[in-house]
Curated annotation (Swiss-Prot):
Species annotation: Desulfotalea psychrophila (strain LSv54 / DSM 12343)
Pathway note: Amino-acid degradation; L-histidine degradation into L-glutamate; N-formimidoyl-L-glutamate from L-histidine: step 3/3
Catalysis performed (reactions): 4-imidazolone-5-propanoate + H2O = N-formimidoyl-L-glutamate
Protein name, entry field: Imidazolonepropionase
Higher taxonomy: Bacteria, Pseudomonadati, Thermodesulfobacteriota, Desulfobulbia, Desulfobulbales
MF term (GO), any: zinc ion binding
């Protein structure tokens, strides 16, 4: 078995203790200023000081050496919350929002998510596949090596299944590890505008069984927000999804403190996402339940809202993950580097905390930490080489990509 030895590199990585990094642990990185990484069959065999890794390499088979040129090495980014499967951008609504129209007002008038629903219904499956694959490849160029993609622009059984099929095709054809999430309860379609309860019943009785039969989605999500789906409606849907074997996620407390974070804690969801308006009480409940907070600072940036209180969450030992929320309405970016910069500059996270949030904790938010998210022995050799002395360059050097190279399972892919 041949080995690859990546040497002459400064390594920075969170280390996996078997659980998400919370509290002070989120800010701790392993650092090897004269580091090396030994890879076999796409998996990490050894990582650490170059001399120690060389000793391991000499005891094995033939070794191919790769000189990293003194560059900084970090884990590949894991993006645990995206809506990359969509048919058309929404630039006109961007102009409306800049002029002062609120996101929820646009939605109530049939725009927003409902505009994307109409576009997906009109799009052919191949067209949707090509545009989604392009966005995934763009994310890869910025250093993302694993990500999640949600459905949610279908809102009927046929189009939700179409979106999941597209996500499944992209997962096969892309080199990234891609996780699909079913988000049938993303908005209330027109025919159910006055009866959201009936729509939830339809999802539970018709959509969910078909989603389970299709076998592509690994999680179920719901937009739990005033004017969309209530706490009780969200509870009914998520409990049904859990009974069908799906992991749970919640769009929680993005606009108002409805209590979605508390519901995530009650149900033992894998993550609660957004959380701009989450209360101290529900943040503590998330901590006690081990729910990961997936924060989306690019959305707050785009909507010109206050940012989620990452510092409060970290101080309460909630593991914080970071994601792009890439979507055509409120966060059109594929760049985890941009997200890290916003987290450091606007959410008071340290560069080390942000890197952990964009890698290890994000992997836990997708139940993927057994194979990605850190440079631990036995995990996939998914890593980045940076143009900079430390990971702080990701926030410090704004407006450019600091990623020199992207490796997936030990192979250079960008």
């Amino acid at each position: 078995m041949s080995h690859q030895l990546f040497r002459n590199t400064r390594i920075y990585s969170p280390m996996d203790s078997g659980q998400p990094s919370a509290g002070k642990a989120q800010g701790k990185l392993a650092h090897f200023p004269n580091g090396a990484l030994l890879v076999a069959d796409g998996l990490i065999v050894a990582m650490g000081d170059e001399e120690a890794v060389l000793a391991v390499a000499k005891g094995g088979a033939e070794v191919e050496e790769v000189d990293c040129g003194g560059r900084c090495m970090i884990p590949g980014f894991v993006d645990p919350h995206t809506h990359m499967c969509f048919a058309a951008p929404r630039e006109a609504e961007f102009a409306q929002r800049i002029a002062g129209t609120s996101y929820l007002q646009i939605l109530s008038e049939g725009g927003g998510i409902l505009s994307s629903v109409r576009a997906v219904a009109l799009a052919g499956e191949d067209e949707l596949y090509k545009s989604t694959l392009h966005r995934v490849q763009t994310a890869l160029s910025f250093g993302t090596t694993s990500l999640e993609i949600k459905s949610g622009y279908g809102l009927d059984t046929d189009n939700e299944l179409k979106m999941l099929r597209v996500i499944g095709r992209v997962a096969v054809d892309s080199c990234l590890d891609i996780v699909a999430t079913f988000l049938g309860a993303h908005a209330i379609p027109g025919q159910y505008k006055t009866d959201a309860d009936a729509f939830i019943t339809m999802i539970v009785e018709e959509m969910l069984p078909r989603v389970r039969e299709q076998g592509i989605a690994r999680f179920c999500d719901v937009f739990c927000e005033r004017g969309v789906f209530s706490i009780e409606q969200s509870r009914i849907l998520l409990k049904a999804a859990r009974a069908m074997g799906l992991g749970l996620k919640i769009h929680a407390d993005e606009v108002t403190d409805l209590g979605g974070a508390g519901l995530a804690a009650e149900l033992g969801a894998c993550s609660a996402d957004h959380l701009l308006a989450a209360s101290d009480t529900n943040i503590r409940a998330m901590s006690q339940a081990g729910v990961i907070a997936t924060l989306l600072p690019a959305t707050a940036y785009s909507l010109r809202k206050d940012y989620a209180r990452a510092r409060v969450m970290i101080e309460n030992r909630v593991a914080v993950a970071l994601a792009t929320d890439c979507n055509p309405g409120s966060s059109f970016t594929e760049s985890m580097q941009f997200v890290i910069g916003l987290a450091v500059l606007n959410m008071e996270m340290t560069p080390a905390e942000a890197l952990t949030g964009a890698s290890l904790n994000s992997a836990y938010a997708l139940n993927m930490a057994d194979r990605v998210g850190s440079l631990d022995r036995g995990k996939q050799a998914d890593f980045l080489l940076l143009e900079g002395e430390t990971p702080a360059v990701l926030a410090y050097h704004a407006g450019v990509s600091s990623v020199a190279s992207v490796y997936k399972r030990g192979e250079k892919v960008h």
